[in-house]
Amino acid sequence: IRGIFLTHGHEDHIGALPYVLQAVNAPVHATPLTLGLIKLKLEEHDLVSKTQLVTHHPGDVVKAGCFSVEFIHVNHSIADAVAFAIHTPVGTVIMTGDFKIDPTSEDGMTDLGRFGMLGKEGVYALLCDSTNVERQGYTPSESVVSESLDRHFKGCKNRIIVTTFASNMHRI
């Protein structure tokens, strides 16, 4: 194993990492926020000093054996999410990770231009996460959520208690 590549810092994507790293010695590649969350998790298992954590940004390309892994910006409910274009000897494999299309996101729009360019070049396989794909319609923009919260907050005279994913920093 030449490397472990993580798309974002949600628990369902990084939670098993301490257990994997007890069996596999490989560098961990991710974006800054994702690595920050990973570091906290590794501290719980006394693995930080034993693990090579490598910071990347959208647009970076990492060589891993005969593969190169390209980081592509995507929008998700956690900042610093990426997809991967894995360039292999037989073709390009795209792993989207979790993503959404939100043109008003504080974290920037998913890089549809790069996905389009890769599509024109030819994609051997697309591995695409698709939460709620069975629902009709589309996911509303975060700006709609923000407007709704503003209306409720302005009308409240006392305490307001709100719950949300702690990793959804833009909403917080």
Go through each PLM region and give its residues.
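His/Asp/Glu-rich metal-coordinating catalytic cores
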Residues: I1-F5, H10-I172
